[in-house]
């Protein structure tokens, strides 16, 4: 989506969150509530866009989190 990759890592833990990567930049956002946890290289305008994308898709992302981690126990 807009060149951003949204992903989970197999060793991720709660709280429910998503990692975002584009080029050499990466960030981590918690899902409930959607909030920035870590940023390495994204500009503030990019972070606002990423946060808006996550807000719009938070239920879908959470569904995929639950499917991923419930299937990998």
Regions picked out by a protein language model, each given a short descriptive name:
Residues 44-73:
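C-terminal structural segments of small proteins and small subunits
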Residues 6-43:
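A short, structured beta-strand/loop element
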Residues 1-3, 24-26, 47-52:
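Multi-pass alpha-helical transmembrane bundles in non-GPCR membrane proteins
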């Amino acid at each position: 989506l807009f060149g951003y990759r949204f992903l989970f890592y197999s060793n991720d833990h709660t709280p429910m969150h998503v990692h975002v990567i584009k080029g050499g930049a990466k960030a981590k956002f918690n899902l409930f509530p959607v909030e920035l946890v870590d940023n390495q290289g994204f500009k503030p305008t990019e972070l606002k866009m990423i946060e808006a994308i996550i807000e719009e898709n938070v239920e879908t992302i959470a569904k995929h989190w639950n499917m991923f981690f419930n299937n990998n126990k």
